[in-house]
Amino acid sequence: NNHVIEGMTEIKVVLSDRREFTAKVLLTDPQTDLAVLRIAAGEPLPYLEFANSDAAEVGDIVLAIGNPFGVGQTVTNGIISALARTAVSISDYQFFIQTDAAINPGNSGGALIDTDGKLLGVNTAIYSRSGGSNGIGFAIPSRLVQQ
């Protein structure tokens, strides 16, 4: 996410096998809170295919992947609670996927995937008074990520 890398002079990407790479910023968009990074891994890396976020429905099961509080790669599950959520005030973009899958600080930029293992969205924010997950998390739909 843009809010994660904004103002950074050096960005490191750590893969699940603990390999670290310096990342190059290809694109940032504060309006949608998206950022695109590139690493030179020297070999093809696994990747997720895009899901059709326009076909998602309230009640669909989803998995949120991230690094909450820096503890390491974590997967949580939940459902899509709402679509096209507009009163989020996270960025200028107004059509977030809302989920009750636990999303905490450190999950930003992580994948929200569907039960087919496809990228449905990019985790970006939570509503929380405590700073932890209250079951109200938001992801940027894959439709926008693909643009």
Q: Which positions does each model-derived feature cover?
A:
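Serine-dependent protease modules
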Residues: 1-147
